[in-house]
Amino acid sequence: MMEILRGSPALSAFRINKLLARFQAARLPVHNIYAEYVHFADLNAPLNDDEHAQLERLLKYGPALASHAPQGKLLLVTPRLGTISPWSSKATDIAHNCGLQQVNRLERGVAYYIEAGTLTNEQWQQVTAELHDRMMETVFFALDDAEQLFAHHQPTPVTSVDLLGQGRQALIDANLRLGLALAEDEIDYLQDAFTKLGRNPNDIELYMFAQANSEHCRHKIFNADWIIDGEQQPKSLFKMIKNTFETTPDHVLSAYKDNAAVMEGSEVGRYFADHETGRYDFHQEPAHILMKVETHNHPTAISPWPGAATGSGGEIRDEGATGRGAKPKAGLVGFSVSNLRIPGFEQPWEEDFGKPERIVTALDIMTEGPLGGAAFNNEFGRPALNGYFRTYEEKVNSHNGEELRGYHKPIMLAGGIGNIRADHVQKGEINVGAKLVVLGGPAMNIGLGGGAASSMASGQSDADLDFASVQRDNPEMERRCQEVIDRCWQLGDANPILFIHDVGAGGLSNAMPELVSDGGRGGKFELRDILSDEPGMSPLEIWCNESQERYVLAVAADQLPLFDELCKRERAPYAVIGEATEELHLSLHDRHFDNQPIDLPLDVLLGKTPKMTRDVQTLKAKGDALVREGITIADAVKRVLHLPTVAEKTFLVTIGDRSVTGMVARDQMVGPWQVPVANCAVTTASLDSYYGEAMAIGERAPVALLDFAASARLAVGEALTNIAATQIGDIKRIKLSANWMAAAGHPGEDAGLYEAVKAVGEELCPALGLTIPVGKDSMSMKTRWQEGNEEREMTSPLSLVISAFARLEDVRHTITPQLSTEDNALLLIDLGKGNNALGATALAQVYRQLGDKPADVRDVAQLKGFYDAIQALVAQRKLLAYHDRSDGGLLVTLAEMAFAGHCGIDADIATLGDDRLAALFNEELGAVIQVRAADREAVESVLAQHGLADCVHYVGQAVSGDRFVITANGQTVFSESRTTLRVWWAETTWQMQRLRDNPECADQEHQAKSNDADPGLNVKLSFDINEDVAAPYIATGARPKVAVLREQGVNSHVEMAAAFHRAGFDAIDVHMSDLLAGRTGLEDFHALVACGGFSYGDVLGAGEGWAKSILFNDRVRDEFATFFHRPQTLALGVCNGCQMMSNLRELIPGSELWPRFVRNTSDRFEARFSLVEVTQSPSLLLQGMVGSQMPIAVSHGEGRVEVRDAAHLAALESKGLVALRYVDNFGKVTETYPANPNGSPNGITAVTTESGRVTIMMPHPERVFRTVSNSWHPENWGEDGPWMRIFRNARKQLG
């Protein structure tokens, strides 16, 4: 039976206005829209009155329900039939944890009520299309129709393909029908294999073969034999990549054989809780570094949010499934798309060349895709710290003559670093009889055929197959699984995981055979033991679907009880679906039909399938010389600063949490004005050291339209110049990931790919001492469609994205682009040696040209000398600022440095040649360094010692003020206000934010950038930052116990525990499941802290599901009430913990006036480094800090204070319960965005109780308790940042 319950309004006023504006633009007479959530409860038994009231209360969240009955025609948008939304999974979990076992499943839709004039059927279809995503949603016209969401179908049996009866044609038909993308020789191989077995193949076996042997999974092109221009080549592409490891194996612990590569890290204190006692402590051991970079291009083209989200999720799983289990740590993300053509902001170089109906626009990708990637990282609890964004789409004269080149099939890059224990780097042995386990969520009928689909050019496969290959994301589930993996590796020698892989392309059909095969075993499986939420799925659908957030593991049979205990505590679902066998055979039994859908020798599936041979021809690009006519420097500057590749990326940065873990030492945002120009990302190796890791990206894809090899060399060079200004040491410490994207089969591209791989793998990297131990390829970067009567193709340039990773000696010595105005000199290190080539530059692109000669690595020895020289200068502390030269050239390098320093530039380019345009806009490798004027001679001497004397040019100095002036020989070449340039540079991000977020907030942020008087972030402290008020109490040896409380989805507990630990507490890991099961109580604790994250993925209001699981369980409710009423206890709630505790007002004395915390005014997750002031309040945690003004990490989507009315707000303030407020950089309390990131009235962001014993706050002091983890800080701070005082105050209060 189904019950329907109304919910809160689903759209804010500005979202409704945007919809109405879109309808008006489409000339649809829609006058008004109202939208509200509707909840559907599938019940297995009727609810009594109390249970019904409880369900209603559970589903009451968000803004208040409209009092009036909605008017207009109903359009009900629900998740696509046959799928279960992430919201449903998490909301159902909450209902069960609150004792509502009669609820089979909760689901949610949006009811749109449309008031309109007379609309034709076609116009209604337009309205419907505007209100839903056909890839993920279904539209109904009556609420009762939602009953179809819960329809259950009978299981369907396996289907046989009549090969023996119909011969080869049966396989050809199945290939088309199932979208298998099998090549002719693979069809021959299968015909031969099954004829020898003497039976017909089942559809599931063919599907499994296609996924396991797709280009996506098998990398056939990279393993192929090559004939180029009739000449047999000596090596495959992969062998040339492996050559880098053979030449420089130094510091690499694992390459090419696992889900990620591993290199040596540093010995540090890894901080985690003991399995038996729950007590957190440091464990001194090597924290080796793992690295991985994936792409998820095809799904992102079809449905950008889930495509990018599952791209990040899959890469995170790769990291976690490395060795015998590892810890993902920090991420990077990248996008290459065609031109944005922002409505009303189209740029002169953007022409509309059309696109296929079935893929979305570049603008859609960049509106939704980054949000999906960021949302997954945010909810999982991994900071996203680095990235790139390129737009390219043009008709150019390239290798194959004049043709369309661009990224209709986008690049969506997802990568990152993690850490792994030394004894877990290598996978274990799988014993015969070992249990084969699926860890994670249930099978669902989604994401079918992703491996094969992403191996085809967009436009080749059937639209329905594209539809089937879209996936859905549930990062909170992945977090639960990762917590289990963490508990396992933390056990050291007792780790129950023998072998682990993630489930990705091809689902279990790919993952399980890979698991057993890699472990040297076969496997026997039972299909019906696989967790499934859809009983009507066929064997093929159960075995081959790509439901996300799953891992496959081998666990020794005697370790299963321990593994079971860990999973239950973390509420991570798992199923034992088989066991390892001696015989290298794969059998899958179906208990329901008592048959064998799979019965194959492993070598048929993974054996010697036909090897590919690529017989290709070389084509050389001629290019046309750049036409300079009509190009002025002033116009070029304005155009280039508006090119999205160059322009400000704030809209891509502030949506992503950049402080979670408390180990982020360098994010994208630089300096007091928080400008996104960092060269690289940096994390500390632990919470107790200054060792660390760095990541940087290099890519220069448009250059490949002129010179394949140069483009590849530049990608490596740019990654190196980006990562150089950190303290790494020997260049051999740097390891690279290479992600290759190409349109295989397109004339000239295959030979070009070979040329590019050879340039990097055989020549440049070995010469530099660089290794590429990991990478990925995507070989179908072409889109085909019909535009009117014309067949069109959009082919991407050959694109190599290099991600560089390194172990750091000291993260504090990372140099940023932020300029200082002390007596200084700016030096350009020009590795282009005066070539100043303009081919395939940003300048060429904004004038719709390609040019002829591009930049290149001109001298490998000088590139190596450059790196070594910068390392020497970093070690000698001679650099004030550093920024590499890249897209946009020297002009952009200097401008970005000036933006970061909020200063002027007085530049002189006289020594850079007579061609001023080329001097300013060439994109040859190099960097600008700022040094003290007094150090200039010593610095030039170091550069000369490294062979760079002829590359160094004095190009002026940074000066106070707002003028950005470039001269040569006393003549002004360019002069403009730095503020004007800053505003131009910001206009793309402003327009994207206006489209995507609340336009009023976007306007306020853009307006703030034009204020030259803005003093930037600043600090005023009312206390001595170096005083340790807890020291006398720590000296007694007593360590009070603090319960570090977490719920499923919480992700900030480790850094919180570390902050309390440093202040003299014993921090104890307490999961809500411990309290609900009675394993742990609160009676032994002196303090309690509820941590940040996404409990239950925030589905029933941020923190509300967590609170209700306490309020609706009598014993646990009493436990919390008793704790809060006990004298001499302290409690802190941060972010999600703040939201949760604000919903426990009925249990917390003196909290009656506390507000609720609701959706930010921007309608967006906000990650900012915000200025707050400590106000006079009873808060015991903030004692002695009143009047202080200091920045703090902010990361939330629902942090806006909501009060009932003005009287409620006045009472809250008059009682003095407000503890922190947002202030602007002038020190004034503010409601203006982004200084106030959520729009809270009067800047309120923390409140306390009347006794001061319980304080809740939205910002994160635990993430910035160490100075090194602050995005910016005054230079005179020591180890501890000012927010450490909160935790020491807590220790002091407890005596």
UniProtKB/Swiss-Prot annotation:
Main location group: cytoplasm
Active-site feature positions: 1135, 1260, 1262
Matches recorded under SUPFAM superfamilies: Class I glutamine amidotransferase-like, FGAM synthase PurL, linker domain, PurM C-terminal domain-like, PurM N-terminal domain-like, PurS-like
Entry keyword annotation includes Membrane: no
UniProtKB keywords: ATP-binding, Cytoplasm, Glutamine amidotransferase, Ligase, Magnesium, Metal-binding, Nucleotide-binding, Purine biosynthesis
Single GO cellular component term: cytoplasm
SMART domains in UniProt: GATase_5
Pfam families: AIRS_C, FGAR-AT_linker, FGAR-AT_N, FGAR-AT_PurM_N-like, GATase_5
Molecular function terms, GO-annotated: ATP binding; metal ion binding; phosphoribosylformylglycinamidine synthase activity
Disordered: annotated span: 305-327
UniProt-annotated binding residues for Mg(2+): 718, 722, 884
Binding site for ATP: 307-318, 678, 886
Record pathway: Purine metabolism; IMP biosynthesis via de novo pathway; 5-amino-1-(5-phospho-D-ribosyl)imidazole from N(2)-formyl-N(1)-(5-phospho-D-ribosyl)glycinamide: step 1/2
UniProt-listed Gene3D superfamilies: 3.40.50.880, Phosphoribosylformylglycinamidine synthase, linker domain (1.10.8.750), PurM-like C-terminal domain (3.90.650.10), PurM-like, N-terminal domain (3.30.1330.10)
Catalytic activity: N(2)-formyl-N(1)-(5-phospho-beta-D-ribosyl)glycinamide + L-glutamine + ATP + H2O = 2-formamido-N(1)-(5-O-phospho-beta-D-ribosyl)acetamidine + L-glutamate + ADP + phosphate + H(+)
Domain spans labelled Glutamine amidotransferase type-1: 1042-1295
GO biological process, alphabetically ordered: 'de novo' IMP biosynthetic process
EC number annotated for this UniProt entry: 6.3.5.3
Subcellular compartments: Cytoplasm
CDD domains to which the protein is assigned, alphabetical: GATase1_FGAR_AT (cd01740), PurL_repeat1 (cd02203)
Subunit structure: Monomer.
HAMAP family: PurL_1
Similarity section: In the N-terminal section; belongs to the FGAMS family.
The protein, known as: Phosphoribosylformylglycinamidine synthase
Organism: Shigella dysenteriae serotype 1 (strain Sd197)
Gene giving rise to this polypeptide: purL
